[in-house]
From Swiss-Prot:
Coiled-coil ranges from the UniProt annotation: none
Gene: SSB
Organism: Bos taurus
Biased composition (Basic residues): 329-342
Phosphothreonine: residues bearing it: 120, 362
Function: Binds to the 3' poly(U) terminus of nascent RNA polymerase III transcripts, protecting them from exonuclease digestion and facilitating their folding and maturation.
GO cellular component, as recorded: cytoplasmic stress granule; cytosol; nucleus; ribonucleoprotein complex
Biased composition (Low complexity): 343-354
Protein name listed in UniProt: Lupus La protein homolog
Keywords, ordered alphabetically: Acetylation, Nucleus, Phosphoprotein, RNA-binding
Phosphoserine modification, residue list: 92, 94, 225, 366
Transmembrane segments: none
Top-level taxon of the source organism: Eukaryota
Subunit structure comment from the entry: Interacts with DDX15. May interact with RUFY1.
Boundaries of every HTH La-type RNA-binding domain copy: 7-99
Length: 404
């Protein structure tokens, strides 16, 4: 009985040895195995067993030349030849590698299968054992993350389209107690591309919805801002002196109301003042302080507290001007940021003191002029999606290609 058990163990070992060596020299692996391809060029295809036993998976099975030779001599595949001195092996010249044509690639693709649902700690041997009675599998590629962790899915190449189809169409397949997702490899990539397109569309829709929500919030904030400023606009007009400036207005109302913004340029005949509080109160106080005759540089002026739609439109324009001035200030700040003492632009800026904020019809604190400079914007280029199967990622292993 013990002898029968030993014989069974040896037969199982020999089968594994044959399977592993025939995989190394097989149609799928050999064209991709750079190291082995270099070896077979050295001696008419012969590779010393001394080299072969350095391949990790074969090494774990045996390093005994006699065991390897005995196993190959019993193989029904008749793929391998053994040298007369029994120290070298090679793929039989009578069974040349298939030419890698588009037709051949398409054939391999049609018998390639995607399987998902394995535990992430599953070993290749576990998966090979599970596939043993599912048809002849020529290659197993364990799909991994960038950090080499197993993703729980594989690509398996069957020996024929028929066996691959039979496997895919077998219902209710499980690995242990886990249901498996099984698809042809081509169908898997089609499904993934459809999912990517769907995700892209959903992302665009979410972005659009978020943008609309932001726009709505901005509009609500703008309306709230407008409501807070209702009654705070005072328009002035008349045959104003050409030298009339914002400082004149600040001086005129300095003790009667806090000015937040002046919409006016030197030489214009009208403008608008935005007060922090109600404009009528500031106007009444200023008139009272000037005996009812409120002038600018000894020129008669018509003063009008804006109301209704005219007021709202004027407020919107002022808010836009404020934002434009703020953006230009931020842009100029970025350009000057980090300038050294030797920089001419920095020296010029430091000589003038602080930067003044004034563009067309806009003003914060002074009447000095400044250049109008816009900020450049970077444009992101969208990545193009493809419906085609991406180039295969070669898994680096002990002998070059594949996981098997």
């Amino acid at each position: 009985m013990a002898e029968n058990g030993d014989n069974e163990k040896m037969a199982a070992l020999e089968a594994k040895i044959c399977h592993q060596i025939e995989y190394y020299f097989g149609d799928f692996n050999l064209p991709r195995d750079k190291f082995l391809k270099e070896q077979i060029k050295l001696d008419e295809g012969w590779v010393p067993l001394e080299i072969m036993i350095k391949f990790n998976r074969l090494n774990r099975l045996t390093t005994d030349f006699n065991v390897i030779v005995e196993a190959l001599s019993k193989s029904k595949a008749e793929l391998m030849e053994i040298s007369e001195d029994k120290t070298k092996i090679r793929r039989s010249p009578s069974k040349p590698l298939p030419e890698v044509t588009d037709e051949y690639k398409n054939d391999v693709k049609n018998r390639s299968v995607y399987i998902k649902g394995f535990p992430t700690d599953a070993a290749l041997d576990d998966i090979k054992e599970w596939l043993e009675d599912k048809g002849q599998v020529l290659n197993i590629q364990m799909r991994r993350t960038l950090h080499k962790a197993f993703k729980g899915s594989i690509f398996a190449v069957f020996d024929s389209i028929e066996s691959a189809k039979k496997f895919v169409e077998t219902p209710g397949q499980k690995y242990k107690d886990t249901d498996l997702l099984i698809l042809f490899k081509e169908d898997y990539f089609t499904k993934k591309n459809e999912e990517r397109k769907q995700n892209k569309m959903e992302a665009k829709l979410r972005a659009k919805q978020e943008q609309e929500e932001k726009q709505k919030l901005a509009e609500n904030a703008e309306m709230k801002s407008l409501e807070e400023k209702i009654g705070c606009l005072l328009k002035f007009s008349g045959d104003l002196d050409d030298q009339t400036c914002r400082e004149d207005l600040h001086t005129l109302f300095s003790n009667h109301g806090e000015i937040k913004w002046i919409h006016f340029v030197r030489g214009a005949k009208e403008g608008i003042i935005l007060f922090k509080e109600k404009a009528k109160e500031a106007l009444d106080k200023a008139k009272e302080a000037n005996n009812g005759n409120l002038q600018l540089r000894n020129k008669e002026v018509t003063w009008e507290v804006l109301e209704g739609d005219v007021e709202k439109e004027a407020l919107k324009k002022i808010i836009e001007d404020q934002q434009e001035s703020l953006n230009k200030w931020k842009s100029k700040g970025r350009r000057f940021k980090g300038k050294g003492k030797g920089n001419k632009a920095a020296q010029a800026g430091s000589a003038k003191g602080k930067v003044q904020f004034q563009g067309k019809k806009t003003k914060f604190d002074s009447d000095d002029e400044r250049d109008e400079n816009g900020a450049s914007r970077a444009v992101k280029r969208a990545r193009e999606e493809t419906d085609k199967e991406p180039p295969s990622k070669q898994q680096k292993t002990e002998n070059g290609a594949g996981d098997q």
